[in-house]
Amino acid sequence: MASAWLIILWSQKQNSQPILWPGHENNISTLIHPTAVVDPAAVVGTNVKLGPYSIVEANVTIGDDCTIGNHVTICSNTTIGQGCRVFHSSSIGEIPQDLKFEREKTKTTIGDRTTIREYVTVNRGTKAHGETQIGSDCLLMASTHVAHDCILGDNVIMSNLSTLGGHVTIGDWAVLGGGVLVHQFTKIGAHVFVGGGFRAVQDVPPFILGAEEPLKFQGVNTIGLKRRGFSVEERKLIKNTYRIYFRSGLNRQDALHKIESDIPMSPYKNQIIDFIRSSERGII
């Protein structure tokens, strides 16, 4: 990547004009490689670097302080927040792999400080939801795929080769191990850790570990919750809640009633109950 910027610096040394985006004539911090193609209808922020052979289509917005690598394609109606990094050969906002898609106007939105590594694909939404959303401070490792209409919260990590079907929802701070496959319309709760190589075909409630085939509850994500600053009392309450739901032998309704009566009031208790009750695909 450094050599790309050397090409621009070299051209300046030869007294030729640096390649600057309109509106940044007095700000040489925004550098666009001569081989990159940027539509005039795109909006590019300050201190942005755009690498060789990358393409930015119309109606794209790239926030300040972003670095876009070489051979990246950012398709129409995509918004990328500030401080993001997109590594080489990634495709952001391409049309969905959905046979029902009829070129309706939909979009892709990515928050601030999110990192998208090599060969990642993110598809735009369909008319069902209209948008694919990725939050702030996320990390999408190499060769991951985010399908149409997915919604990812903040601080989500998708490890190498993990794949989301359409309409998947992932809560804040969730982590998917390498090669995880998530079935369309599945919901992954906040602070969940799914072990590498497994499939999620049913909803995974917040704060837990999931592994095995088929995916099963493996306990509370204690290490993750410690790192996020959950107190001993909060972690104990979450463990007691799931002990009733998964280990008591009660059916779903009876387990939820027992949780409501036996577990002290807590936003985490309410979050678990609301997630389970709203599940449409069933709980692992």
Residue ranges and their predicted role:
Residues 31-211, 216:
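Structural signal for interior beta-strand "rungs" in well-ordered beta-sheet cores
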Residues 1-35, 40-41, 46-47, 83, ...:
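Terminal amphipathic alpha-helical/low-complexity segments used for targeting or macromolecular assembly
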